[in-house]
Amino acid sequence: MTSSNQGNDPSENTLKNAENETPNACEDEKEHPLPDTNISQVETNLSGMEPSSISSQEDMDFQTVQNSQPEAEMTQNDPPDEELIEDSLPLQIPIPKKLTIPRLILCRIIYLSIPQPQPQLHEKKTLSDKMMFHLGEVEMTENDCFHTPILDKMIHPCFLRWRVPFFTTNEISRMIIHLLCSRNFSQAECHQHNASVKQKYVAILDHQNIMNLQRNIVFGRPLRVYYYHPLFERLTQRKASKLYQHKNGNHLFVRPRFYMPQLQTQNTVQKNVFKHSWRAHHKLRLVIITDNNNWKYLCPICGCGFNNFYDFKHHSCSFSGN
């Protein structure tokens, strides 16, 4: 019995296994459709998202097209910045640099241009972004007579030589000093308003033959008197010129210092006589003007201009009463 039972065991086991496998297979068949339903749901979700994403992309493309159209219209209507800068009128600001030359002073002017384009395109730009420097264009003015364009940043020394054939260097320096010390006025105003013109300084030209010395330029400012005696004597004896003895025995001569050579004591005893004689014989009043490219001597009395100092000195107004 035992052997038969043992022999039947494997067959029974196979039957039991077959019976157990059939429900498992049914369960597997029932479990497999579940992921299929999930996949279908995902597909439905994707199919629902696709038209919305497509519509959003179409909206974005439409907006970009609408934004690009006004930009293209602006670029077509508005010229570039270079054309605006070329068409705009620049503001020229002169920057003078003094070039010191013996007896002369010239001015080197570099123009700084600030363009003025349309404001809607350059509202956010600063002033430094708008400025342009003309590095190669230099203008040198010589006494405001004429302009000489020089295409170089640095001026060569050979350009700084300026010679006047009919005037000496001393006369040019004298005229420059006269221009600085006299009030400039035109020739027409000199004829009409000669009496109303007041000068702060009067230029005095020493006579060339006085004491055989070189001519000097003297300005008619108030006399500067240098005293070598106490304050009380200076207040009481201001008008007279005397000899005073210092403590150590040296004699000091008191005289008004008028930038003049040493004269004799008898000529400086009376100050009024001395001033009258000095003004009568050793002084000429003049004004220097520029006419085109030339210098001229202008007489403040008659208003006539002369090309050289000799004609000015010997014209009708140069008598002793002037």
Curated annotation (Swiss-Prot):
Record's protein name: CPX chromosomal region candidate gene 1 protein homolog
Gene name linked to the record: Cpxcr1
Region listing for Disordered, in residue ranges: 1-83
Lineage summary: Eukaryota, Metazoa, Chordata, Craniata, Vertebrata
Feature: compositional bias, Polar residues: 1-23, 37-78
